[in-house]
Structures are given as C-alpha cells and as structure tokens.
Amino acid sequence: MNTSFLIHANQALAFDDFLSYMEIPSLVLDFVSETPDSLHWYFHREGTSTTLFSINYNLQETYEVSIDNLASYDDLKFFPYLVDSLSKFLNGTLDIDHIYEELNEDWIEETIADEVAYLKATLTILPKYFLAQPMDDLAYVSLDTLAPFGVNLHSSTPRIYGYMQYLMRRRALPCLKDWDSSVQG
C-alpha cells in the first residue's frame, strides 16, 4: 500500500526544474509514464531509498504525491518535505498546511506497524506480498524470502521491517520475472 497527498495547481510540472529547486543531488528520476489523461514520475533518493516516490498528474490541475508504506524510515521522514516542496514549487505557497503535523514521527511508526500487519495478514492467505512502488519490477516478499533470517509471521514488527529494509536496500527481494522464469523452466 502507499500513502498519498493531493496538491492542486494550475500549471504543468517541469520535473527537471523541480529537481533543481529541491537542491538535493541524490534525487534521481527513474522513469516517466504517460497515458492519454495522466503523467507519472517515479524517482528515488540515491543511497537512501528502498522504494520509489511518485508524482502523478491527472491533467486536471491535480497532483498526487505518493510513497510506499514500506519505504525506508529516512524516506518516510523526507515525504512531508517533498509534499511541501512540490506545493511551494507549483503554487508558491503550501497547499496542505497540516502536512508536518499529520506526517510526524507518530505517523511513521503507525505506517510501518500497519503495513507490517498488512504484510503478515496477506502472507497468511497468499504466497506473495507485492510492494506498491518497488525499485525493481514486481518485487515481492514471501515467507520463503524471510525464513533464512529466522523471520516468520510471529516475528515482531521491528524485526520484520528491519529485514525487509535489509533485503530492499540490497535489492535482494525476488521479482515476479525471476519467479516466472523458474516456473517456465
């Protein structure tokens, strides 16, 4: 799952100009996706991110900024700044004045706890839990992925989250394309 915020603006986003405005050299654009009625930018912070951020523009003056709920702790802390900066870049002012109050340390803890609980619930009935915005195509976690680390459904939330981050940082989660090739023989 992911968390997202809407920003209303009456101008198109020039993503390269936004990156310059942010003055964060570690921000890297991974790819842009375009449909007839929307634009999507996917990016990460080099050396910090374990999942992708996204900005989605529906071509009707609304931007949706989102982050995967299993993102790194540092990215979850960075997320309100990203929303604030995009709003100021597009509108010259903060469109969401409660962003820092809402997305605080308590929100980070609740987001991680809720997402790990969702992961546990999913893995009790399904063999794979797919990340919402992975760095690699269709990355997922399974009980088999966690077992070598002594992690299972009864492990604590910090332990599960910690090993998930370890695997994601090393880009060691299996991907659906890996699974498909092993099934096809």
Model-flagged regions — what are they?
Residues 22, 41-43, 55, 65-67, ...:
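Extended hydrophobic/Leu-rich segments
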Residues 1-35, 127-147:
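Short, extreme N-terminal segment that most often corresponds to the first beta-strand
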Residues 1-2, 36-37, 87-91:
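A short, compositionally biased
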Residues 89-119:
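Acidic-leaning, charged glycine-interspersed low-complexity segments
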Residues 22-74:
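Short, intrinsically disordered low-complexity segments
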Residues 1-4, 60-62, 79:
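A general secondary-structure signal for short beta-strands and their flanking turns/coil
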Residues 108-185:
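Aromatic/basic-lined ligand-recognition segments
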Residues 10, 15-28, 65-100:
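Ampiphathic alpha-helical segments that act as solvent-exposed interaction surfaces
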